[in-house]
Curated annotation (Swiss-Prot):
This is Protein FdhE homolog. InterPro entries: FdhE-like_sf, FdhE_C, FdhE_central, FdhE_N, Formate_DH_accessory. Belongs to the FdhE family. GO terms for biological process: protein maturation. Necessary for formate dehydrogenase activity. GO terms for cellular component: cytosol. GO terms for molecular function: ferric iron binding. The keyword Ribosomal protein does not apply. It comes from Erwinia tasmaniensis (strain DSM 17950 / CFBP 7177 / CIP 109463 / NCPPB 4357 / Et1/99). The keyword Cytoplasm applies. It comes from the Bacteria.
Amino acid sequence: MTILIIPQDPSENGNPAVDTIPPLLFPRLKNSYSRRAARLRQLAAKNPLGDYLRFAAVIASAQEIVLYDHPLRMDPRARLEESARSGRPPLDINTLPRDAHWQRLLHSLIAELKPDMSGQALSVLENLEKSSSVELEAMAGALFSNEFSQVSSDKAPFIWAALSIYWAQMAALIPGKAYVKAGEQRQFCPVCGSVPVSSMIHVDGVRYLHCNLCESEWHVADAKCSNCEQTRDLHHWSLDSAAVKAESCGDCGTWLKRLYQEKDPAVEAVADDLATLILDARMEQEGFARSSLNPFLFPGE
């Protein structure tokens, strides 16, 4: 059983029980994208992939603007009730109907980004701008179904950026309307069903996986593989960054990055993952498959 998000009776005040370790942290959207952009720019200064990190920072900055220009108004209680009945995440990417809001976010994002783009990136934005609603829906559906060959890798980050704002806005509306019940099988986000981008080791040593879509974080015991939950044959790998390591599992053959706030309080789930691709290459050489997905780095066609 995964982490369950259960509708809260209006007469209830808070959770029925308080866990020592909160199993789920919903997104705190205030300045979240601007913090990511700042971290990307900081990491770009001494990184061989600096140009791409700065490109990602421009997108993150635009996400911050679009987030506040297009607030979302919805009552999540119906989704929470359906989730309780079905056992699926309330914002399940495989079943939740997408309304027109996410495409408005995308077009606003494109308008915000075009003045800062040139060359191939500008051509991609102009192409997306001309895409029909049906075409955009098809691309979103393909990304959510892991059919990455159906969406060019240069379009995917822009589409995902808009979808991420939409899902994060929905997720941020859940606190106060539900309580969380801990469970097992936590390799997928309990809020939306997407995969993590990396794991954050908080200052107190508690590990949370950070969703690559809705920006929620969920707790996974540190002694378990974040993908298959086995406890044997786990190994940590690092190169030149003490704050970033990779955890591999010999049972399922996957790996996921671990970002340590104690080593560097500024670590950010998406930015630090993207800035340490040399570690990805090492893990691939060792024969392990990545169990996560960075929103700025999609598999090629």
